[in-house]
Amino acid sequence: MSLKKFRPITPGTRFRVAASYDDVTTSTPEKSLVVSIKKSGGRNSQGKMTMRYIGGGHKQQYRIIDFKRDKHAIPAVVKTIEYDPNRTARIALLSYADGEKRYIIAPTGLEVGNTILSGPGIAPEVGNCLPLSDIPLGTVVHNIELKPGKGAAMARSAGTYAQLVAREGKYATLKLPSGEMRMVLVVCYASIGTVSNADHMNLTKGKAGATRWAGRRPRVRGVAMNPVDHPMGGGEGRSSGGHPRSRKGLYAKGGKTRSANKYSKNMIVKKRVNKRLSK
């Protein structure tokens, strides 16, 4: 995907950087793989607001994505590469030899007409999905399972990937985009390659309205609220609000949010460093 800049004929286009969508081959999704979703506006089933700053936005249809890739040893041909409004990556429509159609997250380099497979013992080529036990060390992967058979959970957003760095016994060690080194069972499946649309990180909305199109409302600062609404609210005139705190009164700015007793902590070999991997 390439980027598109605009002539500054309006304030909203002056700094806007948008996607060119030259990698998208069709604008009409597969009807059998689309379901309608109703916007919640940040409210739960009782009508009470449980998430602030959500509302409005363009109407969207959800594309059903195959994260399990459980049609083993059945070849599938890539029919289209499509835009998905529900995620940052592109999606690919597969047509299997038995007639079934499914959507998958499209990896970089996958093109219309390519044939891909999933299952044990297949070639580790871009788009193929196989268990970590069959993937050569050093291979870049995405759509990685955390629990066998549950479906992909890691490295699913645009441009992300992980690298298989070691394998010992029933565990494989992966280096994640955050720098974290994590052990995963070798029977878990992963797809070969990196996720498409890596230029997503370089997009610039250009105006506040573009954020509203995505269904996000303005976020009010805590120091601009009253004391009844936020621990940092109130004061005479403009004030700093004191020590930065969350709305619940917990210290903000760098505090640990992960539970120290989380069951999967033993799977983490090295903690993340908050820096993206460099190829």
Swiss-Prot record:
GO molecular function per UniProt: rRNA binding; structural constituent of ribosome; transferase activity
Ribonucleoprotein among keywords: yes
GO biological process: cytoplasmic translation
Gene Ontology cellular component annotations, sorted alphabetically: large ribosomal subunit
Keyword terms: Ribonucleoprotein, Ribosomal protein, RNA-binding, rRNA-binding
Pfam families named among the record's database cross-references: Ribosomal_L2, Ribosomal_L2_C
Statement: the UniProt record of this protein carries the keyword Membrane: no
Bias kind Basic residues: ranges: 268-279
Region described as Disordered: spans on this chain: 223-279
InterPro entries: NA-bd_OB-fold, Rib_uL2_dom2, Ribosomal_uL2, Ribosomal_uL2_bac/org-type, Ribosomal_uL2_C, Ribosomal_uL2_CS, Ribosomal_uL2_dom3, Ribosomal_uL2_RNA-bd_dom
Protein purpose: One of the primary rRNA binding proteins. Required for association of the 30S and 50S subunits to form the 70S ribosome, for tRNA binding and peptide bond formation. It has been suggested to have peptidyltransferase activity; this is somewhat controversial. Makes several contacts with the 16S rRNA in the 70S ribosome.
Similarity comment: Belongs to the universal ribosomal protein uL2 family.
Quaternary context: Part of the 50S ribosomal subunit. Forms a bridge to the 30S subunit in the 70S ribosome.
Protein name: Large ribosomal subunit protein uL2
High-level lineage: Bacteria, Pseudomonadati, Bacteroidota, Cytophagia, Cytophagales
